[in-house]
Amino acid sequence: MTSRTEAVKAYLLDLQDRICSALETEDGGARFVEDAWVREAGGGGRTRVIGEGNVIEKGGVNFSHVFGSGLPPSASAHRPELAGRGFEALGVSLVIHPHNPHVPTSHANVRFFIAEKEGEEAVWWFGGGFDLTPYYGNEEDCIHWHRVAEQACAPFGADVYPRYKAWCDRYFHLKHRGEPRGIGGLFFDDLNEWDFDTCFAFIRAIGDAFVDAYLPIVQRRKNTPYTPQQREFQEYRRGRYVEFNLVYDRGTLFGLQSGGRTESILMSLPPQVRWGYDWKAAPGSEEARLTEYFLQDRDWLGQ
């Protein structure tokens, strides 16, 4: 393990600790349970799960560090120069599914890949971001989420937030449904356009921003009363979350194709979901407004 990899690993382990602590404090009831695991083909990780709390119905904050002699197809398909290289992949990935349908689901990920081959220069990149999936939209929450994202990106250039916001909108899109998964945030991959230290500083800024972006929204919405019908709608919309993760998500596909730990990879799936044949929201309802207004390609900071 190189000094670069060691520095990234130390940061990611600390990030996992800090996020878990903040979420436990906010929930006020449930605690994370840790499952340390070893990957037979190389590496391991710390899966931490939480559930049936005061706020969080199901959540997980995972750290993994895996390595192998060759990259799986999901990682090398768009980068053919990586074929035949050994690799290390480190990351923290989290998903939080709250009980209350007025509290959005959140997802964040920061990761580092390095691929090496004897006699050749190492190829490395960072990836990550965070995105928000509301069930009942609120403009105040959307603006706050994107404002924190913009502030995290600002020291690295005025063009960074718009680029990675647009990438997030493109990435978290269910092509077969013709709709986005949520209201976006940031997404980036293959990041090595700056030197290593700057790229590493950037993912630290993104990782550190998650709690500031999410917890104020949780605090505003966690005590909002809700009906059984609103809970049912939340479960229906969670179905879209499952569809995206199992069909499109590169992290999920990479994990499964590289022999990753299935329980940790599928931790992101919500605990209760429903599908209904050709279900449609009533015209003029809050449920209809979610897709008509919030789940659109919108400039939340420019309106």
Swiss-Prot record:
Q: Does the keyword Manganese apply?
A: no
The primary location reported for this protein is cytoplasm
Q: Which residues bind a divalent metal cation?
A: 97, 107, 146, 176
Q: Enumerate the subcellular locations listed in this protein's record, separating them with semicolons.
A: Cytoplasm
Q: Which UniProt keywords apply?
A: Cytoplasm, Heme biosynthesis, Metal-binding, Oxidoreductase, Porphyrin biosynthesis
Keyword Zinc in the entry? The reply is no
GO cellular component terms, semicolon-separated = cytoplasm
The source's domain of life comes to Bacteria
Active site residues per record: 107
Q: Give the pathway.
A: Porphyrin-containing compound metabolism; protoporphyrin-IX biosynthesis; protoporphyrinogen-IX from coproporphyrinogen-III (O2 route): step 1/1
**E.C. code:** 1.3.3.3
Q: Which residues bind substrate?
A: 93, 109-111, 259-261
Q: Which InterPro entries match?
A: Coprogen_oxidase_aer, Coprogen_oxidase_aer_sf, Coprogen_oxidase_CS
Q: Which GO terms describe its molecular function?
A: coproporphyrinogen oxidase activity; metal ion binding; protein homodimerization activity
Reaction catalyzed: coproporphyrinogen III + O2 + 2 H(+) = protoporphyrinogen IX + 2 CO2 + 2 H2O
Q: Which PROSITE patterns match?
A: COPROGEN_OXIDASE
Region (Important for dimerization) location: 241-276
| Site note Important for dimerization, residues | 176
Main function: Involved in the heme biosynthesis. Catalyzes the aerobic oxidative decarboxylation of propionate groups of rings A and B of coproporphyrinogen-III to yield the vinyl groups in protoporphyrinogen-IX.
Task: Give the protein family.
Answer: Belongs to the aerobic coproporphyrinogen-III oxidase family.
Subunit details: Homodimer.
Quote the protein name from its UniProt record.
Oxygen-dependent coproporphyrinogen-III oxidase
- What's the source species for this entry? Pseudomonas putida (strain ATCC 47054 / DSM 6125 / CFBP 8728 / NCIMB 11950 / KT2440)
